[in-house]
C-alpha cells in the first residue's frame, strides 16, 4: 500500500508543467543542501530556495514523452507494465527466435518512484560504415575495403528528464559512424596511418592511404596506432553529440542530461567508452577486469578545482575551489584549518580568510558528493540548461562530455562461452559489487548449456532482479534486508566468444 501511495504522489508531482512545481519534483539531479551554518555565511546556492534544483523550464503544453528501447518490442500494454513503479516488472527482449546482435542479453527495470518514467535508455546495433572514398581520390571497383561493420552497445542514464538519454540512444552511433568514414581504408591497411589527409578529394596517382604522406619522410614523428584513431573517433563523436544537444535543446525538447556508457566492437577489439557513473567489467574465467571507472566529484576533484582556480568567474562570489574537511564557520576566521587545493592529494593547514567561507565547489562524500551542491556526476552529455539553484551560475563548464576509452583485444585470448562483458547503469552498481556480479555470472551460466543463446538474457535478468530486490513493508529489500536499488536499472551482457545471431 505504501508503494502505491508513493507512486501516486510521484506521478502527481512529476506531471506538473510549471517550473516552480518542477523544482520540487523527485526526477531531478541529486542535490544536497548546505549545513545550517550556511545562514551565517555569504549566500550559498542551497540556502536560497529549497533543497532541490529546478529542472529545465517547460511550457504547459509540452508533452511528456515516454519510450523504451525499440528492441524490447513492447506493446501498449507492455509499455504500461514497464512504466509501473509498484510492480517493477523486469523487461527483456521477447524470446521470438530473433535475438539481439551477438546473442546479447539485456534486462531493465523502472525506478521505485524517484522519477515519473524510466530515464535510462539503451541501444544495440550493427552499423555499417562506408568509406567516403575521398581519402585516395581515385575510383576503384567495389571491394572489401569499401566499408566494414561494427557492433555497438550503449547505455544512457538520464537525469532531470529523459530527453538527453533518448536523443543519445538514437544518434550517438551515427556520429561514431560519421567519424569512422574517413578511417575505413586506413584501418584496413597494415601500414601506419598517414600523417595528413588531402584537403580536397581527387588526389591523382595515390592508390593507398599510406602513400599520402610517408611516415619515413617525417622524422622524428610520434607513433600513432590504429587503436588511437578509433579512440579519437569515439571521443569526437561524443563531443559532436553534446554540441548537437546544445543546438537543439529547445526545438527538440532535449531536457536534462545523461551518463553514457558505450561499447564498439571493431576489427577484433572492444572499445569501451564511459562518461559518467555507469560501469563495465569483464568476467573471464572467474577473473574480474574493470573496463571503466566512475566519474564523480570525488574522482575528478582535482580537475574541477583546477578549472575553478583558472577561471574564478565560473564560481562567482558563491563558491571556493578549495576543499576543507567540513564547512568553514565565520568564527574560525584567522584560524589555521586543514585544506587541499587542485595540486594536492594530501592535506595541509592554511589561515582561514573571508573567501574561504564560501560554499565549496566540491562537497559531500561517496554517492552524496556534488558539484556546486547540485549534480553528482562530472561527465556526460547534455545538461546545457543546468544552473545552480536560484542562481545564474551555469554548471555545464565543469561537466566534460569526453569519455574515457579502454581497449580490449579479443584476439589475445581464448574465450569460453562463460566469459562476458557486463554493462550496467549505476542502479546496478549502487547495491552490487564486482565480486557479486562475477558470482551471479558463474551461478546463472552454469545452469544453461553453452550453446543456449538465452543464457545471457537470463543472466541480465538475474543481475537486475538481484539489484532491485523484493517488495516488503519498508520498500524494496535485498536478501540481506538491506535496501535494494530504487533507481532505474539497465544491464547488457555481451558474450566474448564471438558474434551470435543478429536481426535480419
Swiss-Prot record:
The gene is Ppm1j. Interacts with UBE2I/UBC9. It comes from Rattus norvegicus. The modification Phosphoserine is found at residues 65, 75. This is Protein phosphatase 1J. Residues 59-73 have a biased composition (Polar residues). InterPro entries: PP2C, PPM-type-like_dom_sf, PPM-type_phosphatase-like_dom. Residues 103-496 form the PPM-type phosphatase domain. Keywords: Hydrolase, Phosphoprotein, Protein phosphatase. Pfam families: PP2C. Residues 14-23, 197-217 have a biased composition (Low complexity). It catalyses: O-phospho-L-seryl-[protein] + H2O = L-seryl-[protein] + phosphate; O-phospho-L-threonyl-[protein] + H2O = L-threonyl-[protein] + phosphate. Residues 1-102, 194-217 are annotated as: Disordered. GO terms for biological process: signal transduction. It comes from the Eukaryota.
Amino acid at each position: 500500500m505504501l508503494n502505491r501511495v508513493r507512486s501516486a504522489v510521484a506521478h502527481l508531482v512529476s506531471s506538473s508543467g510549471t517550473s516552480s512545481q518542477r523544482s520540487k519534483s523527485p526526477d531531478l539531479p541529486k542535490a544536497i543542501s548546505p549545513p545550517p551554518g550556511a545562514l551565517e555565511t555569504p549566500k550559498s546556492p542551497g540556502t536560497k530556495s529549497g533543497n532541490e534544483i529546478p529542472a529545465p523550464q517547460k511550457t504547459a503544453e509540452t508533452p511528456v514523452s515516454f519510450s523504451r528501447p525499440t528492441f524490447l518490442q513492447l506493446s501498449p500494454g507492455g509499455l504500461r507494465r514497464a512504466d509501473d513503479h509498484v510492480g517493477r516488472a523486469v523487461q527483456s527482449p521477447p524470446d521470438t527466435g530473433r535475438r539481439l546482435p551477438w546473442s546479447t542479453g539485456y534486462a531493465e527495470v523502472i525506478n521505485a518512484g524517484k522519477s515519473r518514467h524510466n530515464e535510462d535508455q539503451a541501444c544495440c546495433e550493427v552499423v555499417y560504415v562506408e568509406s567516403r572514398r575521398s581519402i585516395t581520390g581515385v575510383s576503384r571497383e567495389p571491394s572489401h575495403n569499401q566499408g566494414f561493420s561494427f557492433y555497438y552497445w550503449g547505455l544512457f542514464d538520464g537525469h532531470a528528464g529523459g530527453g538527453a538519454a533518448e536523443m543519445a540512444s538514437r544518434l550517438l552511433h551515427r556520429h561514431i559512424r560519421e567519424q569512422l568514414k574517413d578511417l575505413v581504408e586506413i584501418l584496413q591497411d597494415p601500414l601506419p596511418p598517414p600523417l595528413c589527409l588531402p584537403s580536397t578529394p581527387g588526389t591523382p596517382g595515390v592508390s593507398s592511404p599510406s602513400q599520402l604522406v610517408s611516415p619515413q619522410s617525417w622524422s622524428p614523428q610520434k607513433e600513432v596506432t590504429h587503436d588511437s584513431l578509433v579512440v579519437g573517433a569515439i571521443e569526437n563523436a561524443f563531443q559532436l553529440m553534446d554540441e548537437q544537444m546544445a543546438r537543439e535543446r529547445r526545438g527538440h525538447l532535449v531536457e536534462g542530461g545523461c551518463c553514457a556508457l558505450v561499447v564498439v566492437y571493431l576489427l577484433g577489439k572492444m572499445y569501451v567508452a564511459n562518461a559518467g557513473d555507469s560501469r563495465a567489467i569483464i568476467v573471464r574465467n572467474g577473473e574480474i577486469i574493470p573496463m571503466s571507472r566512475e566519474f564523480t566529484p570525488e574522482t575528478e576533484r582535482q580537475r574541477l578545482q583546477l578549472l575553478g582556480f583558472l577561471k574564478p568567474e565560473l564560481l562567482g562570489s558563491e563558491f571556493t575551489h578549495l576543499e576543507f574537511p567540513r564547512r568553514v564557520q565565520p568564527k574560525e576566521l584567522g584560524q589555521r584549518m586543514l585544506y587541499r587545493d587542485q595540486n594536492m592529494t594530501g592535506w595541509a593547514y592554511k589561515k582561514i580568510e573571508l573567501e574561504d567561507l564560501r560554499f565549496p565547489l566540491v562537497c559531500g562524500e561517496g554517492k552524496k558528493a556534488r558539484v556546486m551542491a547540485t549534480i553528482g556526476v562530472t561527465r556526460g552529455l547534455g545538461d546545457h540548461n543546468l544552473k545552480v539553484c536560484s542562481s545564474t551560475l551555469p554548471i555545464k563548464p565543469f561537466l566534460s562530455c569526453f569519455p574515457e576509452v579502454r581497449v580490449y583485444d579479443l584476439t589475445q585470448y581464448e574465450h569460453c562461452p562463460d566469459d562476458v562483458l557486463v554493462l550496467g547503469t549505476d542502479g546496478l552498481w549502487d547495491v552490487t559489487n564486482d565480486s557479486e556480479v562475477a558470482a551471479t555470472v558463474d551461478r546463472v551460466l552454469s545452469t544453461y548449456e553453452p550453446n543456449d543463446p538465452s543464457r545471457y538474457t537470463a543472466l541480465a535478468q538475474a543481475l537486475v532482479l538481484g539489484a532491485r530486490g523484493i517488495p516488503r513493508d519498508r520498500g524494496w529489500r535485498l536478501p540481506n534486508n538491506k535496501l535494494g536499488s530504487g533507481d532505474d536499472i539497465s544491464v547488457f551482457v555481451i558474450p566474448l566468444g564471438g558474434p551470435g545471431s543478429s536481426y535480419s
